[in-house]
Curated annotation (Swiss-Prot):
SMART domains, sorted: Aldolase_II (SM01007)
Signal peptide range in chain numbering: none
GO MF annotation terms: methylthioribulose 1-phosphate dehydratase activity; zinc ion binding
Pathway involvement of the protein, from the record: Amino-acid biosynthesis; L-methionine biosynthesis via salvage pathway; L-methionine from S-methyl-5-thio-alpha-D-ribose 1-phosphate: step 2/6
Chemical reaction(s) catalysed: 5-(methylsulfanyl)-D-ribulose 1-phosphate = 5-methylsulfanyl-2,3-dioxopentyl phosphate + H2O
Enzyme Commission (EC) number: 4.2.1.109
Residues that coordinate or bind Zn(2+): 96, 98
Identification of the protein by name: Methylthioribulose-1-phosphate dehydratase
EC category: lyase
Length: 205
């Protein structure tokens, strides 16, 4: 696909997630693979209001996350997370959002380093079809220094689809296709919201 086709594909996903209010305060970032040899990808430009759609929403970067040629914006702060994903998997798209639910879940389960969900129907959206299927999401500590954060993130990038929670920060989800990445993100956020609603009722899932 061309850069422009990938741009439109990522912009459409951004619009959908923005409609859910998943980009508070210009937070979050999205990326989509454009080419493999050499590796290039589009990533959210830093500081953009993702509720608006403009011609400067994304920038094109290389395998190290550096801008390719002259562009008006600069890559999002967490571009190195997408660098890890695209250099080490065949994923096409990765999505990073900061929601209240994923931040609260990451804090509640930070001490054990992961959160596990079992037996929920929505887990099928992640590709697990057994009635008692479980999904485990690793939780890593947040680091203001992005290279340090990327090093903590890297060991969990082990397949073409996955997710990592960053404590009191957000979730990064990636998938084989843009549609898959969005579906996975929606499923994880459903699980987080469901779990927190049960807790509010005094029931622990």
């Amino acid at each position: 696909m061309t850069v422009q086709e990938r741009w439109v594909e990522l912009a459409d996903i951004k619009d959908e997630l923005a409609a859910r209010d998943w980009f508070p305060g210009t937070s979050g970032n999205l990326a989509i693979r454009v080419s493999d040899d050499p590796l290039t990808f589009l990533v959210t430009a830093s500081g953009r209001d993702k509720r608006k759609r403009t011609n400067e929403d994304f920038v094109l970067v290389d395998a190290t996350g550096q801008l390719i040629g002259e562009q008006s914006g600069k890559p999002s702060a967490e571009t190195l997370l997408h660098v890890e994903i695209f250099n080490n998997t065949n994923a096409t798209c990765s999505l990073h959002v900061h929601t209240v639910d994923n931040n609260v879940i990451s804090e509640l389960y930070a001490a054990q380093g992961h959160v596990t969900f079992t037996g929920q129907e929505i887990i099928k959206a992640l590709g697990y079809w057994e009635e008692t299927a479980s999904v485990r999401i690793p939780i890593i500590e947040n680091h203001a220094d992005i290279p340090t954060l990327a090093r903590a993130f890297a060991p969990h990038v082990t397949g073409d689809a996955g997710a990592v929670l960053i404590r009191n920060h957000g979730i990064t989800v990636w998938g084989e296709t843009p549609a898959a990445a969005k579906r996975y993100l929606e499923a994880y956020e459903f699980l987080f919201s469901y779990s927190l609603k049960l807790r509010a009722l005094g029931v622990h899932s």
